[in-house]
Curated annotation (Swiss-Prot):
Tissue distribution: Expressed by subsets of neurons and muscles.
Annotated PROSITE patterns: SEMA
Gene3D superfamilies in alphabetical order: ligand-binding face of the semaphorins, domain 2, YVTN repeat-like/Quinoprotein amine dehydrogenase
Domain (Sema): residue spans on this chain: 74-543
Ranges where the record places region Disordered: 1-24, 735-766, 798-899
Cytoplasmic side stretches: 1-40, 679-899
Protein's UniProt name: Semaphorin-1A
Gene, per the UniProt record: Sema1a
Biased composition (Polar residues): 809-827
Record lineage: Eukaryota, Metazoa, Ecdysozoa, Arthropoda, Hexapoda
Sugar-bearing residue positions: N63, N90, N117, N187, N207, N311, N404
Short name of any one Pfam family annotated for the protein: PSI
Amino acid sequence: MLNSHNTNHNNNSASNSNYNKGHKMHLKSATAKATIMKHKLSKFYGYGWMQVFLLLTVLVIGNQSAWQENIRPKLYVELGPEDVLKFVGNESVVDHFKLVTKDGNSLLIGARNTVFNLSIHDLVEQQRLVWTSPEDDTKMCLVKGKDEEACQNYIRIMVVPSPGRLFVCGTNSFRPMCNTYIISDSNYTLEATKNGQAVCPYDPRHNSTSVLADNELYSGTVADFSGSDPIIYREPLQTEQYDSLSLNAPNFVSSFTQGDFVYFFFRETAVEFINCGKAIYSRVARVCKWDKGGPHRFRNRWTSFLKSRLNCSIPGDYPFYFNEIQSASNLVEGQYGSMSSKLIYGVFNTPSNSIPGSAVCAFALQDIADTFEGQFKEQTGINSNWLPVNNAKVPDPRPGSCHNDSRALPDPTLNFIKTHSLMDENVPAFFSQPILVRTSTIYRFTQIAVDAQIKTPGGKTYDVIFVGTDHGKIIKSVNAESADSADKVTSVVIEEIDVLTKSEPIRNLEIVRTMQYDQPKDGSYDDGKLIIVTDSQVVAIQLHRCHNDKITSCSECVALQDPYCAWDKIAGKCRSHGAPRWLEENYFYQNVATGQHAACPSGKINSKDANAGEQKGFRNDMDLLDSRRQSKDQEIIDNIDKNFEDIINAQYTVETLVMAVLAGSIFSLLVGFFTGYFCGRRCHKDEDDNLPYPDTEYEYFEQRQNVNSFPSSCRIQQEPKLLPQVEEVTYAEPVLLPQPPPPNKMHSPKNTLRKPPMHQMHQGPNSETLFQFQPDGYNTQQSYRGRDNFGTLRSHQVMGDNYRRGDGFSTTRSVKKAVNNTNTRNRSLGRARRQPPRHGIVTQHRSNSPQQQQQQSQQPHSSSGSSPVMSNSSSSPAPPSSSPSPQESPKNCSYIYRD
């Protein structure tokens, strides 16, 4: 392929060289131009389309081998009002709900000027804490140019440091403040107030995060009004201010604490990519809990801050990256195959100007720790690449580690950590690839919540993933291979749930469970709820829909591959997680890995409302179920049958799309070619296309191909086959004005008049040739307007005599030549010049007014203003000039001048 590419490159160079030569010939010949255009078109049609075809073929092959197709959900669920618990809050204004904190059997929801205390059971409001901005702060916010909506107090930090106490921070009209309240049965009592700078953001649109560890609050936010000073803060320590090596325009996502470290997840502009452009990378950073700062100038700076890139990509020779992290789950600890690991799940998106795509990736805490123990990355010069640092250059003790007293660290370690906070290696995805990939122009992933290690009959455990989108949908999925392998992924999308009555982005997802379970009437247990938070409402739904009475068979229940659901062979119905004897495999049938069970008969269920049964292969012969939205309050399940195949047929594969593009391109090419060909055959060219200067405003009245090629005996070539006895040719003869041009028109582009040749300056006053131009006698105002020697204005031809005739202005006169075809051509040219013309009559016709004619008759003839060969009042031929002119009319040739 390399040799072939070089060959094509050389051929292209030779073609370009030929084209350059032809381009020079284009100035001389129109035929050369046509040849070049044919050469270029033949080159394009010859192998240009072949290159396009090969490119599309490679894209198709690459798509088949690398890209993961969108996985269809088993169920499309549309919930009714009785299936959803909803809290709206203030209906007059948008509350901008965002934070959710669990406090026993209560939910604390942070919103606009308010903290709502809701019951987990039914989302009924129990208490309300109202905290508005002081009037002075609101006025100052408005003076600084913010609108009234932004000059409110949006709750952005909310933690429970101890039972009965609540720590809350709000934007407070772009002047952050933090309050500590004591919670009682009836109200909230203010205990303390402090400045919220570097803890809470100024702008409610800024993303921030916080976590409480060992009664110390760690926050990631911005520390100034403009939002240009990002910071990771724990009083009194902070990251370097205005240092792009530490934080470069970050958007914080989440944070958690584990062991001796606190971890932050965010996305930022990649400083290591700055020499190649701008890109956003996902990061994980950590600081040590025991960090006390350094000595002297490092006393208020972190001495343990490190960060690394999170690699969520589709593997291959050229990985496809999902670079922008949007949300992260809590730390999940579980069994994955033979490994016991602690995982963090995150949702990642492509950039907004890229292919719309989202993915879910998991990262092991051990892999993150190993990355922070690896090599550092550095840039030695401003134009240098970012390269790993040799381990021999790393000082001892190692920067970024936890020390008993960081204030005793030596200067080499402190200086190194200040300029080398970025690690060289990326944190790999735990399963070596994304768990779920979705490409859609309709929605992207925004939030994630994970219900960890759900046990199934037989003892296997699975993490159930709930993903929120910016279109108000919930996607429930599971990795069917996670219980048996730590490096394989079999994605199963169990449900796509349409929860909201109107589409709006999901801001937060939380899985909550009550302290005690209440046993419902059907014998199953209420094992939790999914809390969905948007700007205008808080919604709670069940984690599963196993008890739906539309699931009537064992094969339907098992085919869901839902870890929450299993078929109760004694009761003969689908039961949910938490039912009695749930872990006993002898009482329940379930197979999350394949969706099939040997004890469940397969077959098509011909139910009118819900069809389920006949299984079709999809990823290890898994059963796919579809749904049909039948009502507002029920979920309908459809098996893959004729309806599903109709949906499949309505979608197009990549191969079909490529073939359609190729067929359409070829068809368009053929239609364009034949249309141009037939139009060229039927349509005649305009006369202006044959002019020597078609892009100017000059043109010939009439021109013959042989007007400049004439024999020695006559000016005009006779063509007996085409002409009658007398041949007449009419052409435009410009008029020369003798006076100098005005100063303001000396450099005019239309000032193209030229002086007559020097050898004609001594001719007689009545002589005139084709190259000697004389002014019109009736032009009394002596108006000046430069004209080209070769034609007249198109506007003059179109408008006729009305073109600037109000001031007696005229530019040209028409000359008509008549040739008698009966005379012999054998007479010598010298004799023809000595004798006056016998058969030709030279006349001059002018359309002057009577006053102008009288003035002209009284003026004496001069060399500069003499009339042509004959005057207006005389019809006799003029005497010949003393010296014959090369352009003088020969024998048998005559001129007829016309205006």
